[in-house]
Amino acid sequence: FSAALVSVIVALFLGYGKRILPEKMMIISVRTASIGYALPGTVIAVGVIIPFAWFDRKIDSLMGSYFGISSGLILSGTIFAIMFAYVVRFLAVSLQTVESGLEKIKPSMDDAARSLGYRPREALMKVHIPLLKSSSLTALMIVFVDVMKELPATLILRPFDFNTLAVRTFELASDERLADSSTSALAIVLAGLLPVIYLSQTISKTRLK
């Protein structure tokens, strides 16, 4: 859930930044940030672990040289590493949903916020985010489900004794314990139905208006 929440928050800032600064460099930066969804989870995991491992080695070398101690793994094999990979992997999903919500907010709302003396950050917090509650919730649920069923990146980056439903299902199924794996597999399926039900209700309410 934390990874999904961080992904939505980053998407809000990127989407709003693109809205108020529609420059070519900003647009390219946003599109580059959302390229992770087109890459396999394994590729992203390797792309995360290489710089993190390099950083850990450098810090360990410095600690050994100056203090005679080993710092161990600071980033590699931590919850931070796996959350970072999740955000890179699924940022495009939340960004697309947030941008869709921002397109529904008329530019006159930005003009009204500026006329009231709101700075861009204040306009985002007091005007746009309240209007983006539905889009943000949709993005949160979709990314949460995607994170829940992500397997390759989780297997490579997860800390010791850290399991997700996808990993648990994979381990039990690999051991031919199909009956035991069905519980966690069913939980993933049921979680995947939540955004579908929510979106169906939202669409129905929109049509009735």
Please annotate each region the language model reported.
Residues 17-18, 25, 99-110, 114, ...:
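C-terminal transmembrane helix and the adjacent membrane-cytosol boundary/short C-terminal tail
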Residues 1-18:
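Transmembrane alpha-helix signature in integral membrane proteins
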Residues 75-114, 139-140:
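Membrane-cytosol interface at the C-terminal ends of specific transmembrane alpha-helices
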Residues 148, 154-197:
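Interhelical loop and adjacent transmembrane-helix boundary motif
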Residues 13-48:
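Cytoplasmic-entry segments and transmembrane alpha-helices of multi-pass inner-membrane transporters
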Residues 45-58, 85-88, 97-100, 139-149, ...:
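A structural signal for multi-pass alpha-helical bundles of membrane permease subunits
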Residues 35, 39, 88, 95-98, ...:
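Transmembrane alpha-helices
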Residues 25-29, 45-87, 121, 157-160:
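Membrane-interfacial helix termini and adjacent extracytoplasmic/periplasmic loops
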